[in-house]
Design a protein with these regions (language model features):
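Conserved, charged catalytic cores of large soluble enzymes
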Residues: 3-59, 63-66, 134, 143-156, ...
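Single conserved hydrophobic/aromatic residue that forms the stacking wall/gate
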Residues: 474-485
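Non-catalytic terminal/interface segments that mediate subunit docking, oligomerization
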Residues: 295-296, 445, 449-471
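Short coil/turn connectors at secondary-structure junctions
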Residues: 94-97, 123-127, 170-175, 184, ...
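Short, hydrophobic/aliphatic alpha-helical segments
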Residues: 21-29, 74-80, 110-111, 115-116, ...
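Function-dense linear segments that define catalytic or interfacial modules
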Residues: 37, 51-57, 70-94, 99-142, ...
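Internal maturation/activation junctions in enzymes
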Residues: 324-372, 376, 380, 395-452, ...
């Protein structure tokens, strides 16, 4: 790809063009097609650009850290999320992987949701939207007419995602979530099926997810009735057997692979205590269902991702700087996003509320107000993992064997403990996230195992995420996988 060889200075660090040999042809072709910027001729230059960008905090670059981050990436110990690799240090898009937003019930709130989606999708982020508070089909409106329900408005988002793309890397992607008790749940779970029903209420370009809870699972277990309750009137619209509804969900998943299933009771039980004390609540997951963050009328949750490569666990697990550097890197990138949207110098104070915060949004950045506020308050990041199956293969360990279970516990215990330690160290210098004041942590959320479809390709074809390699020979178009990478 590049005729340059050996070690050379580049952007204030030393890169090694010979490390291109660690990549296979598919990796290099993917990088060249989607991720190199302007005059870049080698993946090493892209890795260096992203490393320098991600080692900069409040306009001060730590070049020693940038060198280490570059070394980690070029040795395939980890990979930047594709938004960081594609957009970091450039003028195209944002380095954020995930946005989670809330959809209100009024016309103004619905149209505001469409406008926010346009901003977020065109800037590089995948979106997960919560629709459980939108009144159901047939419910009366303030004008005296009858509501058409939430699905026709999801159809607008469906078209929106086709219209707005994310540059050359991915097209706009969106996952709609609703509650298992919503009256439209039966239609919602099959809205991605091409056959059956009204074509104008089909959303073939969206993903969808169903929020369940422990009460529903108990009803399935005991074969009880389940009430479908309109979120506006709070009245039961229909009563259905819980097992019948559960069976329909499983049938839809067998046919289309979706809807995702998220148990909100489990998610909210694990919410940091500081956020519980503020009355915050998780209402949905994100585009690829790997992270759960609180959302509401004032908050569009933000998450900045990257992933370690477990294929090289034996190497990087001995490096005491590795996880510390990656958590610091993700916090830096999140700070770039916040600084891009808000005038922090004029904001004043460390613990601003939404009303004060939105007064200091920079001109032209109004579409990111809720996202920047959420990032500022909770500073959530998501360090994930890929290469699990590749590690097992390299060590002749059966995927379903006891040694695989042992490695699983060992690897993720190391990642979690190291990430918590890193977040505490960063908080000593930069302060705790306002949402979790008193926790000693910089970040309210630290880990998220993303699908890594593109990142695994870039890492020389390592196995994606924690999934097994499903077959020995296959074709792939990662741009159409719509993953956060």
């Amino acid at each position: 790809m590049s005729e340059k060889k050996g070690e050379v200075p580049y952007l204030g660090i030393i890169i090694n063009y010979d490390k291109d040999k660690k990549l296979d042809k598919f990796s290099i072709d993917t990088l060249r097609d989607r991720y190199l910027w302007q005059e870049e001729s080698s993946p090493q230059e892209a890795f260096a650009r992203a490393a320098v960008y991600a080692s900069t905090f409040q306009e001060e670059t730590d070049y020693a850290m940038a060198q280490r981050i570059y070394n980690y990436a070029s040795d395939l110990w980890f990979m930047f999320s594709t938004p960081i690799l594609s957009n970091g240090g450039t003028t195209r898009g944002l380095p954020i992987s995930c946005f989670l937003n809330y959809v209100g019930d009024s016309i103004d709130e619905l149209t505001d949701h469409f406008k926010e989606n346009a901003r977020l999708a065109s800037s590089g982020g995948g979106i997960g939207g919560y629709w459980g508070d939108v009144r159901s089909d047939g419910t009366s409106t303030s004008s005296g007419s009858k509501s058409t329900g939430s699905i026709p408005f999801m159809k607008v988002v469906d078209s929106e995602m086709l219209a707005f793309n994310q540059g050359v890397t991915r097209r706009g992607s969106y996952a709609a979530y609703t509650d298992i008790s919503h009256p439209e749940i039966e239609e919602f779970m099959v809205m991605r099926k091409e056959s059956g029903g009204d074509v104008n209420r089909k959303c073939l370009n969206l993903h969808n997810g169903v929020n369940i809870n422990n009460a529903f699972l108990r009803a399935v277990e005991t074969d009880d009735d389940w009430r479908l309750i309109d979120p506006k009137t709070k009245e039961a619209v229909k009563i259905i057997k819980a097992r019948e509804l559960w069976s329909k969900i499983l049938d839809a998943r067998a046919e289309t692979g979706e809807p995702y299933i998220v148990n909100l009771d489990n998610c909210n039980d694990a919410l940091p205590q500081g956020q519980k004390n503020l009355g915050l609540e998780i209402k949905q997951s994100n585009l690829c269902s790997e992270i759960t963050l609180p959302t509401n009328e004032e908050r569009t949750a933000v998450c900045c991702l990257s992933s370690v490569n477990l294929e090289h666990f034996d190497d990087w697990s001995e490096d005491k700087n590795f996880i510390q550097d990656l958590i610091t890197m993700l916090d830096n990138v999140l700070e770039h996003f916040i600084d891009n949207a808000i005038d922090m110098n004029n904001l004043g104070g460390y613990n601003a509320n939404y009303e004060r915060f939105k007064k200091h949004i920079k001109e032209g950045k109004e579409g990111f107000t809720k996202a920047a506020y959420s990032a500022y308050r909770e500073r959530s990041i998501g360090l994930g993992a890929m290469g699990f199956h590749s590690y097992l293969q390299a060590h002749n360990i059966p995927f379903e064997g006891i040694y695989a279970t042992g490695f699983n516990h060992k690897a993720f215990k190391h990642i979690k403990s190291s990430a918590l330690k890193a977040s505490k160290e960063i908080a000593k210098d930069r302060g705790e996230a306002p949402d979790i004041s008193g926790s000693t942590l910089r970040n309210a959320h630290l880990l998220a195992v993303a699908p890594n479809a593109s990142s695994s390709i870039i890492c020389g074809g390592t196995s994606p995420s924690i999934e097994p390699i499903s077959c020995l020979l296959y074709t792939s178009d990662a741009a159409d996988d719509e993953t956060s990478g």
